[in-house]
Design a protein with these regions (language model features):
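Extended catalytic cores of very large enzyme megasubunits
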Residues: 1-278
Length: 278
């Protein structure tokens, strides 16, 4: 590294932080710039912001650190969400295109399959749906194929309402190591589901919830046994590390925009700590 960049970087990151230095060099340094030049670029010439970064009191996300003040066409944001995947082939393919374009710009994406009709549900008058899995595989392939501006592969979060008829398939799909390999999975869990689970552990009561849903004029009915799905989820997470949990009542009712009637959180992006609205 030129001038005293190595020493300044070491002071900024802390001693014996070779991993941090390597990451800075490979991911965030632009055109062999010095550490001071990097801070100037990232702060955009703002003296107060420069001081905050230098003192490690503030830092942008990775895409801003890599792309701000450069000629790159990459995004300034790490992650986005496209919300619910539409329950029609045109909308699904358009969303898949949006995923690819987001990855190209170095962003990640989050999508929810909760509005997709389950396997066996009629399509028109002649055919039946193959359900959520084929579209998970399409999105998985796109994520694997599109590099984020040549810097890294795409990042994808796929979520599903735990009351969806295919929740069991979603929970266990990663137990096959060759299927969905390029996406994180999470279940959207509401209070009704968790209350039913709690009744089992408090009173030994097995609650059965009857679900009635309609997909483009085709009604379906089925029963959900929360404790059965809960136990399957816990076992699968123990063995495979996924799926995660998105507690929908919490993030929809406890956020800075909860009193804005026009604001509705639909799902998360791969960062998981940032919930997104469409």
């Amino acid at each position: 590294m030129k001038d005293n960049t190595k020493e300044k970087l070491k002071q900024w990151l802390g001693e014996n932080n070779q991993i941090g230095m390597d990451i800075w060099e490979k991911k965030y340094r632009y055109n062999n710039e010095s550490f001071d030049e990097w801070v100037d670029r990232v702060s955009g010439g703002d003296a107060k912001l420069r001081q905050l970064i230098s003192e490690r009191k503030f830092l942008f996300g990775g895409r801003a650190l890599a792309n701000r003040g450069t000629n790159k066409k990459g995004s300034m944001f790490n992650c986005y969400s496209s919300g619910y995947v539409p329950d029609n082939i045109e909308g699904i393919m358009q969303l898949n295109t949006n995923l690819a374009l987001t990855y190209k710009a170095q962003g990640g994406q989050g999508v929810s399959l909760s509005k997709i009709r389950p396997k066996g549900t009629p399509i028109g008058n002649e055919f039946k749906s193959d359900g959520i899995v084929p579209f998970m595989e399409i999105f998985n392939t796109t994520t694997s194929s599109i590099s984020q501006g040549g810097a890294r592969k795409g990042a994808l979060m796929i979520s599903l309402d735990i009351m969806h008829k295919e929740a069991e398939t979603f929970i266990t799909i990663k137990s096959n190591e060759d299927r969905i390999t390029k996406a994180n999975l999470s279940l959207e869990i509401n209070d009704e589901f968790m209350d039913a689970v709690q009744k089992y552990y408090d009173w030994g009561e097995t609650v059965v919830i009857h679900e009635s849903r309609e997909y483009n004029g085709h009604p379906i009915e089925y029963d959900v046994v929360p404790i059965k799905l809960y136990k399957l989820m816990v076992e699968t997470v123990y063995d495979w590390g996924e799926p995660g949990c998105i507690f929908t009542n919490r993030f929809r009712n406890y956020n800075l925009m909860e009193f804005d009637d026009d604001y509705q959180i639909e799902t998360c992006n791969p960062l998981t700590d940032k919930n997104m609205r469409i």
